[in-house]
Structure formats: structure tokens, C-alpha cells
């Protein structure tokens, strides 16, 4: 199960949250979801030229406006000089959506362990005719040095411009895909090369989450079990004592 399913969707509601954080039970919910998709594609295409390194885009909606949180490795490229870029982007999105748009930019502290940024970096190198093996190995080394506990990268397509398509992957560390508390970041990126499209998949294991919470729950359960056993033992002792104290009937 864990080997086949998308690791992000597999962990939604457990250790991962949705990137569209709003609720609507009206019939226009499909239009709003489509609008979110358009916003993400527009922002990524708009900032791709600036090499801002967009790791994630989170959209929140209220009755009055739309709030967009952009997680970027280079927030200065998103904001621009004196905030010109972010103001222009906000105005363009307001024209597209027909509502007021507010944009917040959050800096990504460690871009070397963000799966989306790793995939985009490899795709950029492949499109500029860098060896796929060199790009993959370099990304793995950088991620492990930055603190990742495990990483796996798979490239599929006409690697090196050969006639027959194939897939190759490199891995270092561990990737526990079946463990739901394991924080596994996943991304899928396509590189458009002269030989054709090359698919890039990246898995990054950043460690376990909810460990303290799980330990606390287990300790609480153990305490309850011990208390229950103690009560049962005390009841057993009381019943034995009552039987011993019961006077014998004499004829």
C-alpha cells in the first residue's frame, strides 16, 4: 500500500494538512477548486522565471478575500524591489479571481530537503544538458548534509538521449513509506528535454513526528491497564479475605 500510494495523500489528516484550507458546502465548490488550481499554476509559471524556488502554495479563503501563502527558497525574488513584484502579482490574481487577494511569503529554511525544490533543480539541470547521474547524486549528497534521514530519486525517460526509455534511481538512508508518523516529503516533476519528457520523482524522509504524543498515549494506556489490574487484584484479595472470615456453621 505505502509503496504505491502518494505519500502526501496517504498522510493527510494524520501528519499532513491540506494546501487548500477552506470550507464551502455550496454548489460552486467545484469552481473554487478549479480557481485554486488556476492560481497555483499561474503563480508557479509567473515566478519560475525569477527562480524563486516555490516549495508549496497554501490557499485560504474568507468571505471577503483570498489569502495565498507562498513558501519560497528565495523570498526576495517574490517580493521584488520595494515590493513591486508582490504588488503586481496580487493585482493580477485579483483580476483573475475577481476578489481581493492577499499574499504572504514564507522563507523555506532548508531548500535542500524540500522534495519539490529538489525535483525542480534536477529538471533544470537536465534541461540544460547536465548528466542525470551527476544531478541525482549531487542532490542526494546535499540533502543528506542538510539533515535528511533518507532520500530516494527516480528518473524515467530517454535518459542521456538514448533511443530506448528506461528508469534509474538512487537512494541513501531509509524511506519508511508504511509508517504513517514518518514525515516523508514527495514530489513529481517533469523535465522537458530535447530527447523528450523525463519524469522525476523525489522522496525525502525528514524523521518521525508525533513521537512524543504517541509515547504519552502509550504511557497513559499502560497506566490505565496497571490501575485496572491493581483493582482486580484488590478485589480478589478482598473476596478471599471475606471467605476466610466467614464463620463456619455448626450443627
Swiss-Prot record:
Read off the InterPro entries from this record. KH_dom (IPR004087), KH_dom-like_a/b (IPR015946), KH_dom_type_2 (IPR004044), KH_sf_prok-type (IPR009019), Ribosomal_S3_C_sf (IPR036419), Ribosomal_uS3_bac-typ (IPR005704), Ribosomal_uS3_C (IPR001351), Ribosomal_uS3_CS (IPR018280)
Which organism encodes this protein?
Prosthecochloris aestuarii (strain DSM 271 / SK 413)
An individual GO BP term: translation
**Superkingdom field:** Bacteria
Q: Which UniProt keywords apply?
A: Ribonucleoprotein, Ribosomal protein, RNA-binding, rRNA-binding
Segments of skewed composition (Basic residues): 240-251
GO MF terms, alphabetically ordered: mRNA binding; rRNA binding; structural constituent of ribosome
Instruction: Extract the ranges annotated as region (Disordered).
Output: 222-251
Cross-referenced CDD domains: KH-II_30S_S3
Any one of the GO CC terms: cytosolic small ribosomal subunit
Family per UniProt?
Belongs to the universal ribosomal protein uS3 family.
Extent of Basic and acidic residues compositional bias: 222-239
Q: How does it assemble?
A: Part of the 30S ribosomal subunit. Forms a tight complex with proteins S10 and S14.
Question: Where in the numbering of this chain does the KH type-2 domain appear?
Answer: 39-109
What's this protein's name?
Answer: Small ribosomal subunit protein uS3
Function, as annotated: Binds the lower part of the 30S subunit head. Binds mRNA in the 70S ribosome, positioning it for translation.
